[in-house]
């Protein structure tokens, strides 16, 4: 029984598209993509920005980094507080062995921002004097 994989068989190979057909399909897909992007912009509104995958990853990294800094600060404060009276290495290690942490974090700890304001258009940097002198 045939597998029906769509790849065709040796007797009836699948027809390969010509470069013209591929170019036509590409134009069609680009037009469809443009229409979908404009429809998405209408749906989202002017005050919001559609995230690209790269921008989303940058925002995730920014939030994780900020929350990690906040957690590290809380942990350090707790360790310093608990080991304040330790005067020897053994005392310090005994206190550390008994510590248990529960860190409370929230997005508000970051000041309420996941990223910089991407709505502002950034200006290109000017040419450096050093590079200008070389040319």
Swiss-Prot record:
UniProt-listed InterPro entries: Herpes_BLRF2 (IPR008642)
UniProt biased composition (Basic residues): 122-135
Gene3D superfamilies: YejL-like
A Pfam entry, by short name: Herpes_BLRF2
Ranges for region Disordered: 1-20, 110-135
The family this protein is said to belong to: Belongs to the herpesviridae BLRF2 family.
Name recorded for this polypeptide: Gene 52 protein
Organism the protein comes from: Equine herpesvirus 2 (strain 86/87)
Lineage, top ranks: Viruses, Duplodnaviria, Heunggongvirae, Peploviricota, Herviviricetes
Gene from which the chain derives: 52
